[in-house]
Amino acid sequence: MCSSDLKRVVHHAWRLNFNNVIHSLKHGYYQGWDLHPSQLPLRYAAVYSFFLDGLASTSLRLKSFMGKAAQATLIGDVFDDAATGQALLNYFLQGISCGAILEKDAEKTGLTLDEIRTRSFKKILQGRQS
């Protein structure tokens, strides 16, 4: 096998691994089981890509949802109800935890840092209702 063939095979493997990580993240699997050290840079890139690519739309979803006092909302073709509130918050908690999202970026959701740090959508709603 010549070096250009090897390069093509390696790049294909990288793309495949990157796409598999993105697929898992989109379906809620935030933990990975990388078996080889060469997979770690790809996971790092995929995790950052996932959080940064979704930052604007997820910020808008959570801000809109909170603005309507957690009533069911429809943005485009995405329907959010109370059951998704914690999942939207978790997106920001995970993104902040890994360093892909800055706390100041999370404030675009309309939540304060103190609210985000409660880690509980239920507590945020209770705090806003009192």
Each language-model region and where it sits:
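Expand to "…catalyze enediolate/carbanion chemistry for C-C bond making/breaking, isomerization
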Residues: M1-S130
